[in-house]
Amino acid sequence: MRYDRVYNFSAGPAMMPESVLEEIAAEVLNYHGSGMSVMEMSHRSPVFQEILSQSEADLRTLMHIPDNYKVLFVQGGGTVQFAMVPMNLMKNGVACYVETGAWSKKAIAEAKRYGEVKIVASSADKNFSYLPDCSNLDIPDNADYVYICENETINGTAYHTLPDTKGKVLVADQSSLFLSRPCDVSKYGLIWAGVQKNVGPAGMAIVIIREDLIREDLPKFVPTYLRYKTHADADSLYNTPNCWSIYCCGKVFQYLLTNGGLEAMAQRNEEKATVLYDFLDRSQFFTAAVRKEDRSLMNVPFFSPSKEQDAEVAASAKAAGFDNLKGHKSVGGLRASIYNAMPKEGVEALVDFLKKYEAEHT
């Protein structure tokens, strides 16, 4: 790669498109003749107001977001959203969660602070290596919403068919597949995504919420900042937002629009993932962690024959220019995160490396 860059398979913060980084670098000292960097710019300035409004407009175009949905840029990332969702949506104090891995478990633990949580399906019995059947969930009449983690970054599963929520509001953590494929926003009540995986710099989440779910009658204990209405009423400018992340995300939105949109991204991501999964399924040395029908196209966990060899593979890969292949500490093994910005040649080069490693160790 140019600039002595490595192929970065990190689950997040993750790769950004090289052309986007070049554009950001060209503007970092003096943005569009303003005489200052976006990092130095007042969030109330007309220049930044234009950055913010254009970023939202481009995201709406990319995702075909209906007019009755608000787009919010909220500081804090996913951990804050684990709390904001139940704080804002638990009107009856009951919510249903599908337990599919590490991140849905964290969301469940946080939601239990604010009300009753019913786990309506789980794949914990097989170490989250598959997605449970969600076609006939036992959803109580008084449930406020059904929550899923649409792509489990650590465990490597992804929904390819949405659950039947029986008319209840669907809430989805889309962090690690956000903007990787087309999305019918109208099927959801709320979508949120930490941006550091597939969009831009860490420290922010994008929230897409249907307007009728933005409540004013929240319990008094809900802080002002943690109310979706606060951000919706202020157009994401209630306080100083993460200006730099908004700006960088906006650049990525423009990149996606000029490179075929989400339909083109979905095709490229399918091609990339197929290269890696086909190798893993043929390998006599490496093993894919997830059953075929539930595999993520973004996060690919896999194992070598032993923990010691997992560590050796990751170290050897790093030395060869393939960085951040070590699996998450909670599950071990190896993991290749191949988000939008990872070029197909990066995945092909990784497969060539793994083939060579296998040949030398079998």
What role is predicted for each listed range?
Residues A111, S122-F178:
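Active-site phosphate-binding strand-loop segment of PLP-dependent enzymes
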Residues M1, V6, A319, H328, ...:
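PLP-dependent enzyme catalytic core of the Aspartate aminotransferase-like
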Residues M1-S42:
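N-terminal "arm"/small-domain region of PLP-dependent enzymes with the aminotransferase-like
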Residues F286-A317:
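Conserved PLP-binding catalytic core of the aspartate aminotransferase-like
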Residues V171, V185-Q196, A205:
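Conserved active-site segment immediately N-terminal to the catalytic lysine
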Residues M90-K105:
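Conserved PLP-anchoring active-site segment centered on the Schiff-base-forming lysine
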Residues V195-Y277, R291, E360-T362:
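Active-site C-terminal subdomain of aminotransferase-like
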Residues G33-Q81, N88, A102, E110:
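Conserved N-terminal alpha-helix of the aminotransferase class I/II PLP-enzyme fold
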